[in-house]
C-alpha cells in the first residue's frame, strides 16, 4: 500500500493545519488577540483562511481541544463558516456562553458537528475512508483550569495514529488507555516534553519514536525562553533513540 505523507503546518501555539491526501483538518487554529497569553496567528493567516488562499485552499474539518483564547475563538469560527462550508466540527461540550451560542448557530445552519464528552471517549469516527478521529477527555493542566473541558485527539491516517495532547495534565494523566497502541507521532507542549523524561512527573509512556513539540511561543512572546529549550531538544533526545521535531516558527511545515 502506498504511504502518503502527513503534512503538518504550524500556525501558532497549538494551532496546526494537517493535510493528508485530499483532506485538510484545522486543529486549534482559530483564535484572536483578546485575552491571548501566547502568540497570535501570523499576519494575513486569518484572511487567507477566509479567502481560501494557500495553504488553506481546502478546509474540510475544524477540531478544537478546549475553549481558551489561544486555541478556540467561537466568533472567529462562525465568521469563517459564514464564508466557507466545512464537512464537520469537533469540540468539547462547554457551558461557556460563547460556545453555547456557536452550538445553537451550527444547529440552525445544519452544519455537522460532534460535541465531545465522556460519552464519546471510545468513539472512533471515520470522517474519510482513510482518516478517523477519536477524542478523549483529559484534564487541563493546572488546578485553576480544572473546570475547562479539554480533549486530546487521536487521528488515524491509513492506520498511522498521531496523538495531539494540547494542554493535557500530564501530572495526573498517564494515558494508560493508549497502552500497547503504537503511535506514529505524539505532539506535546514544551512542559509536557520536559516531564516526559521525568518519571516523578509523568507516570506514563507512549509507544512512539517521534515526538513533535508545539505550543512554543514565538520569539517576541517568549518570556520563558522556550525557543532556546526547543532548539536543544533534538540533541538532548539523541541518547533515548527518539526523533524530536520542534515546531517553533510560523507556517513551519513538517512531514510525518
PLM regions with names:
Residues 23-63, 67, 74-79, 169-181:
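Pre-active-site segment of Zn-dependent metallo-hydrolases
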Residues 103-131, 177-180, 200-256:
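Binuclear metal-ion centers of metallo-dependent hydrolases, dominated by the metallo-beta-lactamase
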Residues 1-52, 147-167:
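Conserved beta-strand hairpin/beta-sheet module of binuclear metal-dependent hydrolase folds
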Residues 14, 34, 67-74, 95-100, ...:
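Active-site environment of divalent metal-dependent phosphoester hydrolases
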Residues 1-3, 130-138:
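Short Pro/Gly-enriched beta-strand edge/turn motifs at strand-loop
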Residues 75, 139-205:
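Active-site-proximal loop/helix segments of hydrolase catalytic cores
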Residues 50-123:
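Active-site HxH/HxHxD metal-binding segment of metal-dependent hydrolases
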Residues 26-28, 58-70, 89-93, 163-168, ...:
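Active-site neighborhood of phospho(di)ester-bond hydrolases with catalytic His/Asp-centered motifs
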